[in-house]
Amino acid sequence: MPSRWPGVAGPPALARTEGGEGSAGHSYPQNSKGTGEQHKADRIKEGHRVYAHIAKLQELWKTTQIQTIHIPKSMTDASFLKHPELTLGQKRYLCSVAKICNSSYLRTLMKRQYMHIFHHGSQKTGVLTHHRGHMSSRYSQKQHSPCTAWRHHLEREDSLSIAAGAPEMIIHSLWRPLRHKEGLKIGYASKTRCKSLKIFRRPGRLFLLPVPSNDSQSCPSEETQEEDLLNKCMQSMSIQEQGPAHASLTV
């Protein structure tokens, strides 16, 4: 069958159809692939936009909201709020400044804050509200507590019993050399010195501490015991002098 279009090997419709189909079939996957990538990119951008919006909302939710300033009715007729060009926000700002500058309002705020701290502290253990009362009660208990008085009484009884049961330790603790004008002599401390010493007991130790004159006068029994111990010690000891600069002690 002779062709109607010379120079064409095959039917042009078929070739065009095949070429069209081939070109269409070749270009269709490219268009679908590009469209899919574009949709994917759009979805990613939309997701980023949504996540950014959610993060912004969360940040705004976490931040503290500024309290709205309400203009009281008593200040609506104030001269500084009657300016026609003032906006509502400017009027609220001026109202807040006027409240801050007002001394009575400051006193009210201070009183409210004080009452809040007072009630908040009273709910605890009473450290803020009754601090002075606790301190005074502790001081009075320390001064007049029966346990403290009983402990002092036991310490005094222990000191007296130790003084009566161990005279040798007391004698040796009271004995010390004295220097006179004539030369070196061996003897005991003066009577006033012995009176000003008081015996205290600690676990495993016995030592002397100076006591004021009032305390020594208020305890005549201890003084008499010390004097008796000194007399006994002096009776049991004799001093022999050998020359002006030598002395020996015999018991």
Curated annotation (Swiss-Prot):
Domain of life (superkingdom): Eukaryota
Renumbered residue ranges of the record's region Disordered: 1-41
Pfam families found in the cross-reference section: FAM216B
InterPro entries in the cross-refs: FAM216
Family classification: Belongs to the FAM216 family.
Protein name: Protein FAM216A
